Amino acid sequence: MAGLGLALAGCGVQAQQPLPGGAATAGQDGLGARARARGIGFGTAVQGALLASDPAYAAAVMLEAQLLVPEFEAKWDALQPREGEFDFAPLDMVIDFARARRKQLRGHALVWHQAMPPWLPEALAEGPARARRVLEAHLDKVLGTTRGVISDWDVVNEPLANPSGSRFAALTPARGIFRETPWLRALGPDYIELALRLARQRDATLRLTINDYGLEADTPWAEQKRQAMLSLVRRLQAARCPLDAVGLQAHLQMDEPFRPEPLAKFIGTLRSLGLAVLITELDVREGRSLPAGLAARDVLVAGYVEAVVGTALAAGCRTVLCWGLSDRHSWLLRDPDVARRDDQQHRGHPLDMAFRRKPMWQALARAFAGR
């Protein structure tokens, strides 16, 4: 791949090796165990309904992941579909699964411009006092209920604007470095600081994270967004606002070039500011043109992943989460904004449709081993 900055042929990526019987089985070391042996946390986004209904899905999660994040169940529309009426039953499915199997949990996401129930934008439009009351009530209930169970939250998700030139810029209005959202309109840029302070007041044990995408590639707009994130972090720190970590979503796009140096420098700067750095939503969208055959495609995906994750780990990142383990239930297939428009499907996860390990699995294992 032009511009990758690393020779994929030298990454040690091999063609797919299906495991006996197809899916991964309990006698084999999963990615979570391999990562943990090196002081790294590895996990995945999960869906509670699938954990309960799909035995192969649940088995893969049990084997491969040590850290789980609810894909949908902790978002605002799931937890508070009507004002003042909370529903924790879907989230409890994930919590119960994790507790029974001694998995750690992180939460996603307390403040976001998507996954809003219909009443929420209307309430925020009533003004800053109403917006603050709504936010306080939500954090009171959610953090009070999950205290001691979820120790790490994406408190604010995707606050930054997409810089001019990026493929998403036209879709996302901006106000300076910030994405224009109902939260920004109601409370101004200080909504970020407010959310972090309120979260810390409600649970002093939490790791408070700001999470965003488009921070990994070697493009002018990714560099602009990296600088915007650093500007936001410094602004918060100057205000003595609590912040513990920055999440890099790492929804990687293979049409974008990658070079290790810009990402390593960015992570190093965040670490020098006293923050942890996490990869929170790793998956891969393949390029517009595809090589013939799944094996060749999977090798390219694996090489890109190994380059990015290896760079991040070497720079001090110690947590890696995939946004799903398997291609079978991937948002890359069901979301029209990211699904392929040809007759192909993205193969951007460590396991295939039958939960067999792909070269991306091997690439992650190698990155965790530091090879």
Segments the model singles out, each with a brief description of its role:
Residues L67-P81, P90-L215, E286:
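Substrate-binding cleft and catalytic face of glycoside hydrolase catalytic domains
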Residues G32-A37, P55-Q66, D92-Q104, L143-R147, ...:
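Acidic (Asp/Glu)-rich catalytic clusters
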Residues A49-L63, R133-V142, E223-L236, G303-V309:
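Short, acidic/polar
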Residues G43-Q47, D154-V155, A195-E223, L278-E281, ...:
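Aromatic-lined carbohydrate-recognition surfaces of secreted/lumenal glycan-active proteins
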Residues M1-P18:
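N-terminal export signals
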Residues Q66-P70, N157, L206-D212, M229-E256, ...:
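Aromatic- and acid-rich polysaccharide-binding/catalytic face
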Residues G21-E64, E71:
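Boundary/entry segment of secreted carbohydrate-active catalytic domains
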Residues T25-R34, Q80, T145, D154, ...:
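Aromatic-rich peripheral "rim/lid" segments of glycoside hydrolase catalytic domains that contact
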